[in-house]
Amino acid sequence: PHMLAVASLRDEQETDSSQRLWVHGKGEDTKMADNSVDVVSLAFVIHECPETATDALMKEAFRILRPGGTFIMTDNNPQSAVIQKLPPALFTLMKSTEPHSNEYYTINVVNMLKANGFEHAHQEQTDPRHRTVLASKPL
């Protein structure tokens, strides 16, 4: 909630922030209207979730996106050479603070988006350790 307060304060200082809405709540149940937003953006969220929650987040994103709207997520890239080559002790230490990372590293996010009705789902490597996954809601 503190970051939302910072975002709201910064919005007050801008001339045109009327289109932004900062919300603290469950991503799986936003209470937003169907077809009401143009973009759903998740940054470093999915690796924190069990697979069932990831699927629920995608279903909710699809529901609230307007036709033609964009889903975008940035997170760790399980296929990244950097992550693949981590020493076992360091990888174990990293996973010890991330209880759902085993699930995250085995799910196919692109296929999950397609299964939830999204089209044009694809991923791009953002940097040596991270990826961005994009998809759109059909028109």
How would you name each of these model-derived features?
Residues 55-67:
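A short glycine-rich, Lys/Arg-flanked "PGG" loop and its adjoining helix->strand segment in the class I
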